[in-house]
UniProtKB/Swiss-Prot annotation:
Residues 98-101 are annotated as: G3 motif. Pfam families: Septin (PF00735). This is Septin-10. GO terms for biological process: cell division. Gene3D superfamilies: P-loop containing nucleotide triphosphate hydrolases. It comes from Mus musculus (Mouse). The modification Phosphoserine is found at residue 414.
Length: 452
């Protein structure tokens, strides 16, 4: 076993006796890459109106027709647009992600969070595709961000707190290239001081920006020199201006012309050379080998996967899976037991509550029953009294119906006697009246006789 390990660690070099043909592997790789095409994803971070879209148009010499953004966005949102470009026989699928509304809010505390979430979402999407049983990475559109062009306002003073917080949050997730936007607004001397101040602040605050690789002999010299020019001071423009006998891209001012591709005026050419011509593949590789691997490792560690066991022995995926399965099984059993105990406890508590409620209801029932019996007894007593009154009333009624006839007869005879007596009295009175009248008449007639 030891000899086998030794053979693996120290392979022997052999000379071939003739031509085989694997020398064409680089050509095969190139042909396959050309057939598949390439993808490159750029994240542009900067405040609204700082020149992000103009610079991208100038970099790729194409009008991408970006939509204008408002300065009154309530929150930061990211807008991704993908384009198919072709130069000679090389196809490039370019995705430009723009931060809409970045730095426009009054409260900028969490302005960087949507950017971080977007980058993590692209890593997560690639990871989910990678762990599938049937993977389709050949046709998968890789949306992971390969480079972040961070546009810094040309204040000439120092970095804003928002810029420091954002770059600090992104430096372990994406390759950051800081840019001083609209560099034609400050003088050359101020620009050099501003560059030194920015780099000093980035180092003090521990912000890791992308450094052009110097491990390749073919590009180490130029990359090392370009690292000293960071951050790049750039100017973007698609306007063609006539300078001498040729047309150049630039900006026309009353005091002169700023040529975009003139290295004495700005660092646009340096940025294009480093970003597109020299280090585009390194940016793609750094994204996959460094930033994505860091995200993947953290995710797997969160899931419990480790490379080494408790005794510093390497663990296979199957062993890790079995260990994690047993751990999850034990955790499930423990949680089930806790849930059972909690269920029993809650049942007991509920039973106690129900028994207490039952006792209260029984006491209330007894109380209402007692009140009902008392009311019933009162009603029975009232009914008995009413019956007695009814019997007494019936007796009185019968008595009243018997005596009224006798009293009526007695009263009738007395009435007749009174009538007879009244008639006799009337007759005697009438007689008396007649006698009186006769006497008067006689008295009157006697004087007449005397006079005669």
């Amino acid at each position: 076993m030891a000899s086998c390990d030794e053979i693996k660690e120290h392979p022997r070099s052999l000379s071939m006796c003739g031509h085989v043909g694997f020398e064409s592997l680089p050509d095969q790789l190139v042909d396959r890459s050309i057939e598949q095409g390439f993808c490159f994803n750029i994240l542009c971070v900067g405040e609204t109106g700082i020149g992000k879209s103009t610079l991208i148009n100038t970099l790729f010499n194409t009008n991408f027709e970006e939509l204008e953004s408002s300065h009154f966005c309530p929150c930061v949102r990211l807008r991704a647009q993908t384009y198919e470009l072709q130069e000679s026989n090389v196809r490039l699928k370019l995705t430009i992600v723009n931060t809409v509304g970045f730095g426009d809010q009054i409260n900028k505390e969490d302005s960087y969070q949507p950017i971080v979430d977007y980058i993590d979402d692209q890593f997560e999407a690639y990871l989910q595709e990678e762990v599938k049983i049937k993977r389709a990475l050949f046709n998968y559109h890789d949306s992971r961000i390969h480079v972040c062009l961070y546009f810094i306002a040309p204040t000439g003073h120092s970095l804003r707190t928002l810029d420091l917080l954002t770059m600090k949050s992104l430096d372990n997730k994406v390759n950051i290239i800081p840019l001083i936007a609209k560099a034609d607004t400050i003088s050359k001397s101020e620009l050099q001081k501003f560059k030194m101040k920015l780099m000093n602040e980035l180092v003090i605050n521990g912000v890791q920006i992308y450094q052009f690789p110097t491990d390749d002999d073919t590009t180490s010299k130029i990359n090392g020199a370009m690292n000293g020019h960071l951050p790049f001071a750039v100017v973007g423009s698609m306007d063609e201006i006539k300078v001498g006998n040729k047309m150049v891209k630039g900006r026309q001012y009353p005091w002169g012309i700023v040529q975009v591709e003139n290295e004495n005026h700005c660092d646009f050419v340096k940025l294009r050379e480093m970003l597109i011509c020299t280090n585009m593949e390194d940016l793609r590789e750094q994204t996959h080998m460094r930033h994505y691997e860091l995200y993947r490792r953290c995710k797997l560690q969160e899931m419990g996967f480790v490379d080494m066991g408790p005794e510093n022995k390497p663990l296979s995926l199957q062993e890790t899976y079995e260990a994690k399965r047993h751990e999850f099984y034990g955790e499930r059993q423990r949680k089930e037991e806790q849930m059972k105990q909690m269920f029993v406890q809650r049942v007991k508590e509920k039973e106690a509550i129900l028994k207490e409620a039952e006792r209260e209801l029984q006491a209330k029932f007894e109380h209402l029953k007692r009140i009902h019996q008392e009311e019933r007894m009162k009603l029975e007593e009232k009914r008995r009294m009413l019956e007695e009154e009814s019997v007494a009333f019936a007796k009185k009624k019968a008595t009243c119906e018997l005596f009224p006839n006798q009293s009526f007869l007695a009263s009738g005879s007395s009435i007749r006697k009174d009538k007879d007596r009244k008639k006799a009295d009337g007759a005697s009175a009438f007689c008396d009246c007649l006698t009186a009248q006769e006497s008067v008449r006689l008295c009157i007639s006697s004087p007449r006789k005397d006079m005669d």
